[in-house]
Design a protein with these regions (language model features):
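A basic- and aromatic-enriched beta-loop-alpha substructure that forms the phosphate/nucleotide-
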Residues: 114-128
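Eukaryote-biased recognition of electropositive, low-complexity segments
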Residues: 234-236, 240-274
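Domain-core and long-helix interface of multi-subunit machines
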Residues: 7-25, 34-57, 125-248
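Generic structural signal for hydrophobic
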Residues: 69-70, 92, 145
């Protein structure tokens, strides 16, 4: 085995150990499994310039195909995070299905001219319209989400759009201060990127968060309501209905059986657990 192969193997093992370590903290009877990042054909306005020029969607996968894959991979609750819209979620809710409303919004850090993706959950159709406007300024976007108790996750934190070239490390400090939740396992990214992201998030001690705030020249709690709490999530980022649900997040819901017996919806339990 050459050095490159050995390196990739060790990265894979480290990522698996990180996942197993986190999973072991949740009692087996109090787990909800959800893929927090997947797409169907309602992701029809791609971010990529070529896709916009050609007028093609990011995927032609139907909702039924996506749901079948999610079920086959053992998810307990469904969300569909299409780009900048939650049409699939609203359609499923209209059919009487229990769904956690979600979308992947393309947002901009205006002071750096850097584009990022923010997974957002628990909003209403009216709030979706407002989020679509605010996404051009991620600071206003996050403020609105905090004000209305909407859950946000920074998707694939090491992948962003920077037309002016590689941005300064201050961008990473700003992102670390902006968000509480980070997608550290993305099914479309190589193990090295996921491990590097997990290491970055795990390194956000209280001391490091204060150092980040000094470098960013802002108070630690300017945006985050709980600046010292950092959570890690996972999602398949599936666009082909091939891997949806094979990567995801295990949520901890204490007294899950009692909540289900009392008639609580899985979507509400998932939202509260996030």
């Amino acid at each position: 085995m050459n050095n490159a192969s050995l390196f990739r193997q060790r990265l894979g093992e480290e990522l698996e150990n990180t996942i197993l370590r986190s999973q072991s903290l949740i009692p087996e009877g109090e787990r909800l499994r959800i893929d927090l990042h997947c797409h169907d054909r309602n992701s029809d306005k791609p971010d990529e310039r070529l896709g916009r020029m050609l007028g093609v969607p990011e995927t032609w996968v139907t909702t039924d195909e996506l749901l079948a894959t999610l079920r086959s991979n053992g998810t307990d609750i469904v969300t569909v995070t299409n780009h900048n819209n939650a049409r699939t979620c609203w359609e499923l809710l209209e059919k009487g299905q229990d769904v956690l409303p979600g979308a992947e919004f393309s947002c901009t850090l205006p002071d750096f001219e850097v584009g990022i993706h923010v997974l957002t959950y628990g909003f209403t159709p009216a709030q979706e319209e407002r989020l679509a406007v605010l996404r051009k300024d991620v600071y206003r976007f996050v403020d609105y989400c905090n004000e209305h108790d909407l859950v946000t996750v920074l998707a694939h934190p090491l992948q962003f759009h920077s037309p002016k070239g590689i941005p300064s490390m201050e961008v990473m400090d700003r992102l670390g201060l902006l968000f509480e939740r980070f997608e550290v396992v993305n099914g479309q990214r190589d193990a090295w990127q996921n491990v590097l992201t997990a290491t970055w998030v795990e390194g956000m001690s209280e001391e490091e968060i204060h150092a980040m705030a000094r470098r960013a020249r802002q108070p630690v709690d300017l945006f985050a309501r709980r600046p010292y709490i950092k959570r890690m999530t996972g999602g398949s980022d599936d666009h082909m209905a091939m891997y949806a649900g094979s990567t995801g997040t295990i949520l901890h819901v204490p007294d899950l059986a009692a909540h289900r017996k009392a008639g609580a919806s899985l979507s509400s339990l998932a939202l509260n657990a996030l």
